[in-house]
């Protein structure tokens, strides 16, 4: 789950940095209109990234898990229902963060450096019980923290969807918050590209 989040953030960050570097945000502004629409741009980007990562998740969960005989105790419908808010929160976080980069290399330098802390905060390498409570709470701002916790319980332990409702709620809250940040970030980028 951390790998999915970090590759998505780096990839979306590189696209955002490239768009800034080469002035591609101007192409997203509809010609002849004074008012720029932000939500269709954010929704379109989110749909494309979700389509790409749906294929990636199918490979990881459908083929990779079976090929290496990883435990698959969860129900497919529960796992898909869990992955939807996880994927959306990662995508909107990626779009929001991508608006901060002026060049594509900046995303690699920052987000690759953030990968180890994201792994530690997720609870995958350091158990939650070994972390200070404030650090655990801070880690909840990343989708991977709730994603790892819920996914392990669903996939490996065979938990039902109702057992991971707390993580699902956190992921939906992150989706809404990061969706708002993404819309604001894209709006500011489009405004800057329009020269206003």
What are these regions (language model features)?
Residues 51, 62, 71-196:
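Membrane-spanning alpha-helical segments of multipass transporters and channels
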Residues 1-58, 62-75, 160-164, 180-196:
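Transmembrane helix-boundary elements of multi-pass transport/secretion proteins
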